[in-house]
């Protein structure tokens, strides 16, 4: 079970949004590389990074900040935002990104996901961000007419490493993860699922470690870590104890 600390990038800074709204961004660190180092020092094992500007632009927009992070941490980094063609995927993987996350392109160009997953086994994940059950695209600015399960099932045999499922309504609001929807998705497919959006407290970590959530690979923690509502030492100790049991 992995707890991924999140770094969302906007204008080269580390921010958190509320419900994916770029107008509701709070800057938490002017130096994303320093934030990445802080997470590494706290004992986290895997970093989750999103290029928010890239998600809206459809191409990488915070490459300098991402590359700076890669230089200062040794833990694996998964990256999403603006990754919509094979050339961009190849470029990021060659620079040291452990796993790329394809979001909008997974809805609009599923063949890209299948091609990339075949070319780079274990290094391609799909990000499914749902609003009222349907997947949103273009940095969450547009809603599609397909459900997360519809999309996920397209990639059952494609070799996708993970599905990162976000409930947009809860993202950045500290209301707790939508466990019902996330676990239902995980139980309906064979691809590992990572929970995202709304992780609020140590109680969410306990749920993550419960038998109910046994099909989940992990969860992403954002605002709760920055606000101090989730103590990283306590959370990682809980996960460590569960692994040792």
From Swiss-Prot:
A GO CC annotation given for this chain: cytoplasm
Localization: Cytoplasm
Disulfide bonds: none
Domain of life, source organism: Bacteria
Sample GO molecular function, one term: 1-(5-phosphoribosyl)-5-[(5-phosphoribosylamino)methylideneamino]imidazole-4-carboxamide isomerase activity
One of the GO biological process terms: L-histidine biosynthetic process
EC number per UniProt: 5.3.1.16
Entries under Pfam families matching the protein: His_biosynth
Alphabetic keyword roster: Amino-acid biosynthesis, Cytoplasm, Histidine biosynthesis, Isomerase
Catalytic residues in the record: 8, 129
Pathway given in the UniProt record: Amino-acid biosynthesis; L-histidine biosynthesis; L-histidine from 5-phospho-alpha-D-ribose 1-diphosphate: step 4/9
Annotated catalysed reactions: 1-(5-phospho-beta-D-ribosyl)-5-[(5-phospho-beta-D-ribosylamino)methylideneamino]imidazole-4-carboxamide = 5-[(5-phospho-1-deoxy-D-ribulos-1-ylimino)methylamino]-1-(5-phospho-beta-D-ribosyl)imidazole-4-carboxamide
UniProt similarity note: Belongs to the HisA/HisF family.
HAMAP family in alphabetical order: HisA
Protein name stated in the entry: 1-(5-phosphoribosyl)-5-[(5-phosphoribosylamino)methylideneamino] imidazole-4-carboxamide isomerase
